[in-house]
Amino acid sequence: TVPLVIEKIFKSSVFPTIRKPMVKSIMKIPGLASVIYKQIRKKLLHAFGGRIRTIVIGGAAINQEVEDLMKAVKLPYTVGYGMTECGPLLSYEDTRKFVKGSCGKPVHRMSLRIDSDDPRAIVGEIQARGDNVMLGYYKNPEATAAAFTKDGWLRTGDLGLMDKDNNFFIKGRSKNLIIGANGQNIYPEEIEDKLNNQ
């Protein structure tokens, strides 16, 4: 599902209730937060037809507050990452092993790397190679040449990090990156996420 659908459900049905001052106070009492989360889960399951095996999210980054709540109410979800040029899935992880905030690990027969001196700490472009990667753009050798590195990796245009377990974390788009006056990297996607949580 596209995150906007999930976010719309949470923002219209769940957040108005849990943001009420009385509910916020009750959730601070030990043991009561879990009772409220169970009720939220029950209502969400009912809204989705009574049973959810897995919610697979893709197409855009998920709002952090929505993801936190999905985790808290124990909805089985995962986030996949892909693009048309890669047929389309690049990374995914089973819900039982999924790391919050990530888009999973490279799928079978695909390799991902971060074009960075330190892919765990310094954001770089996510690059892909594997059986599902396109050969090139139809009748457009210039675009094809620009899309690939000299050693044959597809430039996704997405920026990210990876952890020691090979989970990937998308931070933004290279075309959207703003360099601040002090040299700080500013990702509009992170600002948008914060504004969406207000």
What are these model-predicted stretches?
Residues 1, 5, 9-98, 111:
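Gly/Ser/Thr-rich phosphate-binding loop
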Residues 1-2, 55-58, 73, 80, ...:
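Generic beta-strand/beta-sheet core signal
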Residues 83, 117-119:
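Short polar/acidic secondary-structure junctions
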Residues 102:
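Active-site activation/catalytic loop segments of kinase-like enzymes and analogous catalytic loops
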Residues 190:
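Phosphate/diphosphate-binding loops
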Residues 198:
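Phosphate-interacting basic helix/loop segments used at nucleotide- and nucleic-acid interfaces
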